[in-house]
From Swiss-Prot:
General function of this protein: With S4 and S12 plays an important role in translational accuracy. Located at the back of the 30S subunit body where it stabilizes the conformation of the head with respect to the body.
Organism: Bifidobacterium longum (strain DJO10A)
BP GO terms, sorted: translation
Name this polypeptide is given: Small ribosomal subunit protein uS5
Ranges of Polar residues composition bias in the record: 12-23
Domain notes: The N-terminal domain interacts with the head of the 30S subunit; the C-terminal domain interacts with the body and contacts protein S4. The interaction surface between S4 and S5 is involved in control of translational fidelity.
Keywords: Ribonucleoprotein, Ribosomal protein, RNA-binding, rRNA-binding
Length: 243
């Protein structure tokens, strides 16, 4: 075999080795990409499922806390979270973890376990009420449509998640976020429907509920009926156009 043939054979072998190496690298990159896409896809699906729950959440406060041991101190984070559907259901939760996202996730889970219904009339509460927790006191009063939520940050978070759009509030005593939020929850849990109060007292509804509340409820019922009729008419028009 001549020197030229030997060189050509060596070049051919090197070319084959290079092609094989590049092919293996591409295969490994493809497998890594598939694994990465799988993980990202799973996370994306979880986010979409969480978004599908249609729940609002507000992180009221995040505190850094520490626990002293014999060998030193361990630091962690505590998150106070409010969760609600924006339509009369709300809950408050408290979560602790060494990482902030984990603490918030635990707070959301705890809030979902303690959700309750809030009586409302056209976006406001049914009657004045006062809630307490430790040294904190929160006063809630009904408000006319368009008033808005007159409240501080802690109380506002609870009102927004509960779907209350018009309310007057006053916070007294302790200004600690945990006490204020828990006092607000205590006040909301004391709210009652006018029918419940009338049944308990053995009186007629108009003898218990003020005229303004009855007018607001009647207006709310009329608005809801009108919205349903408009939605039904729009749906019928779409079906007719489709035919």
């Amino acid at each position: 075999m001549s020197d030229n043939e030997t060189k050509e054979t060596q070049v051919a072998e090197e070319t084959q080795n290079t092609v094989a190496t590049e092919s293996n690298n591409e295969d490994r990159k493809g497998r890594r990409g598939q694994r990465g896409e799988g993980r990202r896809g799973e996370r994306r699906n979880r986010r979409e499922e969480n978004h599908g729950d249609e729940l609002l959440d507000r992180v009221v406060t995040i505190n850094r806390v520490s626990k002293t041991h014999k060998g030193g101190r361990t630091f962690s984070f505590a998150a106070l979270v409010v969760v609600g559907d924006g339509n009369g259901t709300v809950g408050v939760g408290y979560g602790k973890s060494r990482e902030v996202p984990a603490a918030i996730a635990k707070g959301q889970l705890d809030a979902k376990k303690h959700m309750f219904s809030v009586p409302r009339v056209r976006g406001t509460i049914t009657h004045p009420v006062q809630g307490h927790d430790a040294a904190g006191t929160v006063l809630l009063r009904p408000a006319a449509p368009g008033t808005g939520v007159i409240a501080g940050g802690s109380v506002r978070a609870v009102m927004e998640c509960a779907g209350i759009t018009d309310v007057l509030t006053k916070s007294m005593g302790s200004a600690t976020a945990v006490n204020v939020v828990r006092a607000t929850v205590d006040a909301l849990k004391q709210l009652e429907e006018p029918e419940e109060i009338a049944a308990r007292r053995g009186l007629a509804l108009d003898e218990v509920a003020p005229d303004a509340l009855l007018r607001a409820r009647a207006a709310g019922i009329a608005e809801a009926r009108k919205a349903r009729e408009e939605a039904a008419a729009a749906k019928a028009a779409e079906e007719k156009d489709g035919e």
